[in-house]
Amino acid sequence: VWIVEFIGGSKSSRAVIRKGQPHLLSATSSRGEVITILDETHKPAAGSAIWFGGRRYECDDKGRTLIPFSNEPGKRTPVIETTDGFASLANFQHSTESYQLHAGIRLDREALRPGAKATIMVRPTLTVAGQPISLTRLEKVRLVLVSTDLDGISTTSTVSDFKVASDREATHEIRIPNRLSRINIR
């Protein structure tokens, strides 16, 4: 930072000249917002910190720190503090901790014959704040099958401790009941 003063003709002017400034990168993780502080050469600024929400968040040796999710999402303006004593304002989008579980489920129509065995394939995805995260965060996963016969009588079957993985489909084999009218898989 330089302060330049020009004086001439009984007038003076001052200018503050700043060459570069720290800025931040924000990425959503499963635990919150990972903030990386970069210096004016776009390299991680180890030892820097962020003042946000009345708290000081210290950065690690890679210039990263974790800010927890918010109950009120939106654009936020923290203060970046560098190791050489400078401070600067920055902006980032603060997300809320909202989980969503979606699943692609496939059951071959050709296997829906009375008494036949059919394989249900399930491919779930779990997201937090719109970012995919590992399925290992799920506990007590179960598959619920509701079959309804031609008389309108429904039968519910639950598969407890249903094993799911991020890299492959989970499968479960069922026997198709007689007089099946509809099957609902959850």
Q: Predicted regions span which residues?
A:
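N-terminal, cleavable Sec-dependent signal peptides of secreted/periplasmic/extracellular proteins
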Residues: 1-186
